């Protein structure tokens, strides 16, 4: 959806397959996290878990210049998010945690719900990007609060699922 809006998109993954369809549509493939951070003002991560986020964020922050923005779209540990935010601030890089809800269908259609934690002024500057990926995008507070809201949302969804299962027994 970012490509469809006419914006230039740089991509990186340790494997080529996940980014191939984007490259075929016009995205530019980068050979490393370092080259991605050199080409991009806004770096967005969507990774499987906290360990991957910690590794990739650390590597990205090593090569990011001041004034750039790092965004984590993963569902993650609020304490890890605050740790990354502290490191980013030391490097004069802005950081937002922005976990998403809506699955692959929402991602493909640009209709994700995004719960964003971090500085409001940074959130506001990314309005055109949020418009590409989500229809319900909310700034919910400081660093880590995006993930707190997402985890509460998950807990409520799972509680409802368990209640429904119990009712059917």
Please tell me what each predicted stretch does.
Residues 25-27, 44-46, 111-114, 154:
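Short low-complexity, flexible loop/linker segments enriched in glycine and/or proline
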């Amino acid at each position: 959806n970012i490509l469809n809006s006419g914006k230039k998109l740089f991509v990186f993954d340790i494997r080529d397959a996940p980014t191939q369809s984007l490259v075929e549509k016009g995205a530019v493939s980068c050979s490393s996290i370092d080259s991605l951070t050199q080409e991009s003002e806004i770096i967005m991560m969507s990774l499987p878990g906290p360990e991957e986020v910690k590794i990739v964020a650390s590597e990205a922050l090593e090569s990011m210049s001041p004034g750039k923005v790092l965004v984590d779209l993963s569902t993650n540990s609020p304490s890890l998010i605050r740790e990354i935010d502290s490191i980013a601030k030391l490097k004069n890089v802005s950081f937002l945690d922005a976990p998403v809800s809506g699955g692959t269908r929402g991602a493909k259609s640009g209709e994700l719900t995004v719960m964003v934690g971090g500085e409001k002024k940074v959130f506001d500057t990314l309005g055109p990007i949020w418009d590409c990926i989500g229809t319900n995008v909310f700034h919910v507070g400081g660093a880590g609060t995006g993930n707190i809201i997402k985890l509460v949302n998950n807990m409520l969804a799972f509680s409802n699922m368990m209640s429904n299962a119990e009712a059917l027994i």
